[in-house]
Design a protein with these regions (language model features):
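Sec-dependent N-terminal signal peptides
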Residues: 1-4
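C-terminal motif of bacterial Sec signal peptides marking the signal peptidase cleavage site
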Residues: 6-8
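Bacterial signal peptide processing site
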Residues: 10-12
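Repeat-blade elements of multi-bladed beta-propeller folds
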Residues: 18-29, 54-77, 91-118, 131, ...
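Blade/loop signatures of beta-propeller domains
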Residues: 18-48
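N-terminal, post-signal-peptide region of Sec/Tat-exported proteins
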Residues: 43-59
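A short beta-strand motif characteristic of beta-propeller blades
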Residues: 47-51, 86-91, 126-131, 172-177, ...
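Short loop/turn segments that connect beta-strands within beta-propeller blades
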Residues: 81-84, 121-124, 167-170, 208-212, ...
Length: 293
């Protein structure tokens, strides 16, 4: 499996991340997971470099301070130079990585199938801290300021069905919310006050960032195995019922359902002010009106 670099890009979305043109410290572009890119691509993108790896790269790649970080199915976590693609360091773990890493304050945060979340030094890969959960972690983590603005928090989901908020410096648990089934998708942090994610129990959850208490719960028609996409107070997601759904986060009301053919939607959507864009198992990219579905 190879990692490719085409161009550098950044997000305009507000969050805990430093806004540098070549920085992409959280998968999906920012805390809200809108999937938007703040710069355009050239007409004919050039491949700058390629890195050969020993396993499949399942999770997204992130970038901070000219360092590219990614995990793979062989249990290798790798950091390479953004400009040249040369390896800076590599660490081997006992289990594989499906989750995307996130980077903040010179620290890499990544969940592993060994049931642990790791905080590692960006420049060396050395341990800072780790916590153990009750099942594998396939979802990426998110980064946000605490509601009082005095600290930074990690928000994470796991296959144990638990959404957790942790102190980014120490790993200390701030709160947790338990569901009945595994959670496979990265949680979105919206407007600095909501935590949003879908679960394998068919529900879309909106939690209060401050204490993890549920605010709204939208019932879908099948397991939600992917990450949601948000923009403003709007959220979209796909599921195994072969549908894409759109809802209002403030009211918790389902606004529309979209279906085309009998193929599930397992990819994370991108959302802007007009449309929802999502890839389906039918090998197509679907562009859906955000207003009407």
């Amino acid at each position: 499996m190879m990692a490719l670099l085409l161009v550098g890009c950044h997000s305009d979305e507000k969050g805990a991340q430093k806004k540098d043109r070549d920085d992409w410290p959280v998968a999906r572009g920012g805390a809200g997971l809108s999937g938007q890119v703040g710069v355009g691509l050239p007409p004919k993108p050039d491949i700058k470099w390629m890195v050969q790896t020993e396993g499949a790269i399942v999770g997204e790649t992130v970038v901070s301070k000219d360092i590219v970080v990614f995990g793979n199915s062989a249990g290798l976590l790798t950091a390479v130079d953004l400009k040249s693609g040369k390896k800076k360091w590599q660490r081997e773990f006992e289990q594989s990585f499906e989750a995307a890493p996130a980077i903040f304050d010179d620290t890499i945060f990544i969940g592993c199938e060994d049931m642990k979340l790791y905080a590692l030094e960006l420049k060396t890969g050395k341990d800072k801290w780790s916590i153990e959960t009750d099942d594998k972690i396939t979802a990426g983590v998110n980064l946000t300021k605490s509601p009082d603005g005095k600290a930074y928090w990690i928000v994470m989901n796991g296959y144990d069905g638990v959404c957790r908020a942790l102190d980014a410096k120490s790993g200390k648990e701030i709160w947790k919310h338990e569901t009945e089934q595994p959670i496979n998708g990265t949680p979105a942090v919206v407007n600095g006050k909501w935590v949003v994610f879908g679960g394998c129990d068919h529900f879309l959850y909106t939690l209060n960032l401050a204490d993890g208490k549920p605010l709204t719960k939208v019932e879908g028609e099948a397991p939600i195995v992917s990450t949601v996409g948000t923009e403003g107070s709007f959220v979209a997601w796909g599921d195994h019922s072969n549908k894409v759904m759109g809802a209002d986060l403030a009211s918790g009301e389902l606004e529309w359902k979209y279906s085309d053919r009998k193929f599930p939607f397992m990819a994370a959507p991108a959302v802007d002010k007009k449309n929802v864009y999502i890839g389906g198992r039918d090998k197509k990219i679907h562009a859906i009106s955000r207003e009407s579905g």
